[in-house]
């Protein structure tokens, strides 16, 4: 029977529940257990697709086209397992389903209430993950903080769940904070005690406490937490701040988290095989070379808006024994100061995705700058569209060339609305979403990087290259190196006269893994290394 581990958080938000859940997933997988991870988000949005990146961070897209919480990116990268729409559930989606059932008459005249109808729907979503993916263990991260009114239905549902499936089949892991009062030099356990008290008042007794801390927890502090929170001292897990998120699985393994959870679930605590992960962490902390990559974006005030892009760059650096330093640059600041002032000295540039016309001129100016100076460049989604606008304006001599999204009155809409989007009125869930095939043209940079004729990548867009300008762009030196199998949609463009200039309509960052870096990011970092004073031979690897 599938076992269930529920991960909750207390004291403060953003305490690291997602990384703890992802790390535990990695540790269980290293013991040959299959895992699936579900994120329960307490906001009333049906999904994060229409939320501001400044409020939510990145929207992570799965193969089946779900727009999900960025934690699903951590789950995929840490467990090397694809997630789906099953793995992210929001309050909005729960209430939408409950109201739909009520309108359909499923409740047969009952008064629809939080208990039992909403909690039953939540439990059904948890069971559905177990039923359809059939893992040994389902990890469930409950978003928000214990005490938040929005989280109460989820906490009540997971309280009931242990009774429904049996005590031996459920473990509760609570992530909390043990702050250090630096003026006094003391670590305080009261926030943890009150957080557990709040959780117990709901009816949940945590089995394991994962305590975030700046310094190692003394034995006496662990014993005090154990005494006041009614948790065995060996189940008080120290989670000291780590140099990187990729250190966390090793930190938690050293503390015995996976072993404690497996004992609670009556599963065999096998010996883990973490050799590959340990090698990754060793490479991360001891790079042989260093490169600096600029990310020119609209939302750089919150770098989590580009989380998968940043991680994909680091993955490529790991494979090449190179440390990757990121220079975050606002495209609006480039509009004010010019690209020379902000991009000078970088080894490569990424222009990632986004929506709306704010900061677009800065993105286009950045692309023009790297194109003219031979700086390695990778454009993603909107980044490709801006590269097309740059070429249309400056090389193809199309006056006021632009995207229809930014200027509906442009005489040259080199980027146009997808035909199937013309009658769409709703914003949420209506983009071209999910995994689609792409045919790679032979004898191109894309063909060299991928090493395959047909690839599959994840999309999230509403606009596309305007085929009315395809011949003009080809005649002026552009190469279209990737198209949809029916040749209708342009998916990859590149410049053969440039050392490394490639841009995609899709989002390759979503498929990069620490142990399997994406070939486009690998190519960018390798090109950045070659552009430095001591060039290195090409060491590209195919995606597995």
Curated annotation (Swiss-Prot):
- Known catalysed reaction(s)? UTP + L-glutamine + ATP + H2O = CTP + L-glutamate + ADP + phosphate + 2 H(+); L-glutamine + H2O = L-glutamate + NH4(+); UTP + NH4(+) + ATP = CTP + ADP + phosphate + 2 H(+)
InterPro entries (UniProt xref): Class_I_gatase-like (IPR029062), CTP_synthase (IPR004468), CTP_synthase_N (IPR017456), GATASE (IPR017926), GATase1_CTP_Synthase (IPR033828), P-loop_NTPase (IPR027417)
Q: Specify which residues bind UTP according to the UniProt entry for this protein.
A: 13, 188-193, 224
Q: Where does Mg(2+) bind?
A: 71, 141
What Gene3D superfamilies does the database record attribute to this sequence?
3.40.50.880, P-loop containing nucleotide triphosphate hydrolases
A GO cellular component entry from the record: cytosol
- Keywords tagged on the record: ATP-binding, Glutamine amidotransferase, Ligase, Magnesium, Metal-binding, Nucleotide-binding, Pyrimidine biosynthesis
Top-level EC class = ligase
Annotated segments matching region Amidoligase domain: 1-267
The record's function comment reads: Catalyzes the ATP-dependent amination of UTP to CTP with either L-glutamine or ammonia as the source of nitrogen. Regulates intracellular CTP levels through interactions with the four ribonucleotide triphosphates.
NCBIfam families found in the cross-reference section = PRK05380.1, PyrG
Subunit note: Homotetramer.
Q: What is this protein called?
A: CTP synthase
């Amino acid at each position: 029977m599938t076992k269930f581990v529920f991960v909750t958080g207390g004291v403060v938000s953003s305490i690291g529940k997602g990384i703890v859940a992802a790390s535990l997933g990695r540790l269980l997988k290293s013991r040959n257990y299959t895992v699936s991870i579900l994120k329960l988000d307490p906001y009333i949005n049906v999904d994060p697709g229409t939320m501001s990146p400044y409020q939510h961070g990145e929207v992570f897209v799965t193969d089946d086209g779900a727009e999900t919480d960025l934690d699903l990116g951590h789950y995929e990268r840490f467990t090397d397992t694809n997630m789906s729409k099953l793995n992210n559930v929001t309050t909005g989606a729960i209430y939408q389903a409950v109201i739909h059932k009520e309108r359909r008459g499923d409740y047969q005249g009952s008064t629809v209430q939080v208990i039992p109808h909403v909690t039953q729907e939540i439990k059904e979503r948890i069971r559905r993950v177990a039923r359809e993916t059939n893992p040994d263990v389902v990890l469930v991260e409950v978003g928000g903080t214990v005490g938040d009114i929005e989280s109460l239905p989820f906490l009540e549902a997971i309280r009931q769940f242990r009774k429904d499936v049996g005590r031996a089949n459920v473990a509760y892991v609570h992530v909390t904070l043990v702050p250090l009062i630096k003026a006094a030099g003391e670590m305080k356990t009261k926030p943890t005690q009150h957080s557990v008290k709040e959780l117990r008042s709901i009816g949940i007794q945590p089995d394991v406490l994962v305590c975030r801390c700046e310094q190692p927890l003394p034995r006496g502090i662990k014993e005090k937490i154990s005494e006041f929170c009614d948790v065995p001292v060996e189940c008080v897990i120290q989670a000291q701040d780590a140099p990187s998120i990729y250190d966390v699985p090793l930190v938690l393994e050293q503390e015995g988290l996976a072993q404690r959870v497996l004992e609670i679930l009556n599963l065999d605590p096998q010996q883990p095989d973490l050799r590959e992960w340990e090698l990754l962490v060793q490479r991360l902390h001891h790079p042989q070379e260093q490169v600096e990559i600029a990310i020119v974006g609209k939302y750089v005030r919150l770098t989590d808006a580009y989380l998968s892009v940043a991680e994909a760059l680091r993955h490529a650096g790991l494979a090449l024994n190179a440390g990757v330093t990121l220079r975050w640059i606002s495209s609006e600041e480039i509009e004010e100061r010019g690209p020379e002032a902000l991009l000078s000295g970088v080894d490569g540039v990424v222009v990632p995705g986004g929506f709306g016309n704010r900061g677009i001129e800065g993105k286009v100016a950045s692309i023009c700058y790297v194109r003219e100076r031979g700086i390695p460049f990778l454009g993603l989604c909107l980044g490709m569209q801006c590269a097309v606008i740059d070429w249309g304006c400056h090389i193809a001599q199309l006056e006021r060339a632009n995207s229809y999204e930014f200027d509906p009155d442009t005489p040259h809409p080199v980027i146009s609305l997808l035909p199937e989007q013309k009658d769409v009125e709703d914003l949420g869930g209506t983009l071209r979403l999910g995994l689609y095939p792409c045919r790679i043209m032979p004898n191109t940079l894309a063909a060299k990087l991928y090493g395959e004729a047909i690839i599959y990548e994840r999309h999230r867009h509403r606009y596309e290259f305007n085929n009315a300008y395809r011949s003009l762009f080809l005649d002026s030196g552009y190469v279209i190196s990737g198209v949809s199998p029916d040749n209708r949609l342009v998916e990859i463009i590149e410049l053969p006269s440039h050392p490394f200039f490639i841009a995609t309509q899709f989002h390759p960052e979503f498929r990069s893994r620490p142990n399997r870096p994406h070939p486009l990011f690998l190519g960018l970092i390798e090109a950045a290394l070659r552009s430095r004073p001591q060039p290195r031979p090409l060491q590209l690897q195919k995606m597995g």
